[in-house]
């Protein structure tokens, strides 16, 4: 954690997510997504030892991210900046922190899924070097049905 937060001159800070963060995480998750993760999913990720981070500003949780790492690959499972602070660089900061963690675990590539309708996230991922490598049909729940997922990847080596 110290390597991620030590060089930060701003009033925001990154730290590992804890179970006692889940009330605040869920509050942001519910505001950010029409089909949010459940508290149980976050709890299970933490208990499984997945790297998970929160971003705080002046003591208030404004973002979080969850990563899984196995067999030389990392998978970004959830990355979210609170709606009121989106487009301020917080998502990029969280993404870069996850990429640093993945590199530290010697992951060779990082994968993620994103809704095709999420233009801001797609632009962020492209800006950090991710490329679209596929599509998962009907992956996400959506109002009135299902939405595909774009599968994106970044080679770290």
Language-model features: locations:
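Conserved catalytic-core motifs of GNAT/GCN5-like acyltransferases
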Residues: 111-113, 126, 131-151
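ABC family nucleotide-binding domain
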Residues: 85-86, 90, 118, 124-128, ...
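Short glycine/proline-centered loop/turn elements that form peptide/ligand docking sites
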Residues: 95, 118-121, 138-143
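Acetyl-CoA-dependent GNAT
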Residues: 2-9, 13-88, 92-105, 138, ...
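Short amphipathic helical patch at the helix-1/turn junction of helix-turn-helix
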Residues: 81, 115-116
């Amino acid at each position: 954690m110290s390597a991620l937060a030590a060089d930060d001159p701003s009033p925001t800070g990154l730290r590992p997510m804890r179970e006692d963060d889940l009330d605040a995480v869920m509050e942001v998750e519910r505001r950010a997504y029409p089909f949010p993760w459940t508290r149980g999913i976050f709890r299970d990720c933490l208990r499984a030892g997945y790297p998970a981070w929160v971003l705080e500003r002046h003591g208030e949780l404004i973002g979080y991210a969850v990563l899984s790492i196995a067999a030389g690959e990392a998978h970004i499972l959830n990355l979210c900046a609170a709606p009121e602070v989106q487009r301020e660089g917080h998502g990029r900061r969280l993404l870069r922190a996850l990429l640093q963690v993945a590199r530290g675990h010697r992951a060779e590539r990082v994968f993620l899924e994103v809704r095709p309708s999420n233009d801001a996230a797609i632009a962020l991922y492209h800006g950090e070097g991710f490329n679209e490598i596929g599509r998962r049909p009907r992956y996400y729940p959506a109002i009135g049905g299902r939405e595909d997922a774009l599968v994106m990847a970044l080679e770290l080596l």
